[in-house]
Swiss-Prot record:
This is P2Y purinoceptor 1. It is a multi-pass membrane protein. It comes from the Eukaryota. Expressed in muscle, heart, liver, kidney, lung, brain, spleen, but not in testis. The chain crosses the membrane at residues 52-74, 88-109, 126-147, 167-188, 215-237, 261-284, 304-325. One of its GO terms (molecular function) is G protein-coupled ATP receptor activity.
Amino acid sequence: MTEVPWSAVPNGTDAAFLAGLGSLWGNSTIASTAAVSSSFRCALIKTGFQFYYLPAVYILVFIIGFLGNSVAIWMFVFHMKPWSGISVYMFNLALADFLYVLTLPALIFYYFNKTDWIFGDVMCKLQRFIFHVNLYGSILFLTCISAHRYSGVVYPLKSLGRLKKKNAIYVSVLVWLIVVVAISPILFYSGTGIRKNKTVTCYDSTSDEYLRSYFIYSMCTTVAMFCIPLVLILGCYGLIVRALIYKDLDNSPLRRKSIYLVIIVLTVFAVSYIPFHVMKTMNLRARLDFQTPEMCDFNDRVYATYQVTRGLASLNSCVDPILYFLAGDTFRRRLSRATRKASRRSEANLQSKSEEMTLNILSEFKQNGDTSL
């Protein structure tokens, strides 16, 4: 096990208040409590599983996410034209996932290297920035996909004009702008720090110096870019399910794709997004307000659970390609057609090379004067 002190920075306001009460009332207990709370910080115990669990998850996400999203982008660019509105959102979702998985090799090395960051402060900031851009970009694009499907199912005629590709492009540009602006403070809060053992940490949140303001920022982004989209998605899906029950859509492609969409997106939120945001908030609160000797074991458990949810939060990059395959507009059919075409082309090339090789062999025999063939 490795001890990594969070900090020895006092919780200034609370400590000063307690110290003032102790001085005013002459109460040594309160004064000593103030002294403890102003100086004591739990030593964070990093157990061995964190050095193996996270890199194992990230390796899995990198392999599956890289292959799945590469195929998805290839399909959208070369085989899905003309795009529908929902294809625009899915392409942007695949792009966000692909950019994130490209950053994982550095993170994998970081954890195999016992969390000693060797890539510099700028790369650390960029790593954390891209993670959060992917996280909240994915949530917002899933919200757009859900709203798009809701309009198509519940108001199929009224929504014809609103579901055009041009409008989806405008919305996608707006989503990217919102996410980049909202996440840009991460470039300030994140960064590297030197531990007592001279190794370098890459903060996944921030140092204790900026922890309280980061907590406020984190809560604002959680409410605006997670809670509100989740409520909108649940509302859309409730109305979609209601429409599927009351409308005559038995065995229609729209019904099937809508059901797949509901199941996959809710699974992603239940497994990846909800646990991560709950445990991230608890971990920040523990670092801020639960710094007493009797709370250190609790803080260690919170931190360990938070690390588990960090791995789960990255799994959406593996699951999203399943969404394109099952719930996308004609994605599965065109992927099958593209693979068959590529297979036929490969067979034709192989046959052509075989014929060329045979002709070359016959030519060599003739040149050598061998007429036995």
